[in-house]
Amino acid sequence: ETSYTLNEVVPLKEFVPEWVRIGFSATTGAEFAAHEVLSWYFNSELSVTSSSN
């Protein structure tokens, strides 16, 4: 069994709008494969401000 690890820090603030949803996508072409996310960490330094609607 082959195992791969991907570890990448991406400054999302430079690429995405203020409100965004994060997800995963993977493919192997025509072959079958199982893709497992064994660990996920997300950190945000977003300053939350309250607003009256």
From Swiss-Prot:
A GO molecular-function annotation: D-mannose binding
Alphabetic keyword roster: Lectin, Mannose-binding
Pfam family for this entry, one: Lectin_legB
Record-linked InterPro entries: ConA-like_dom_sf, Lectin_LegA_CS, Legume_lectin_dom
Subunit structure: Tetramer of two alpha and two beta chains.
Family, per entry: Belongs to the leguminous lectin family.
Name used for this protein in its record: Mannose/glucose-specific lectin alpha 2 chain
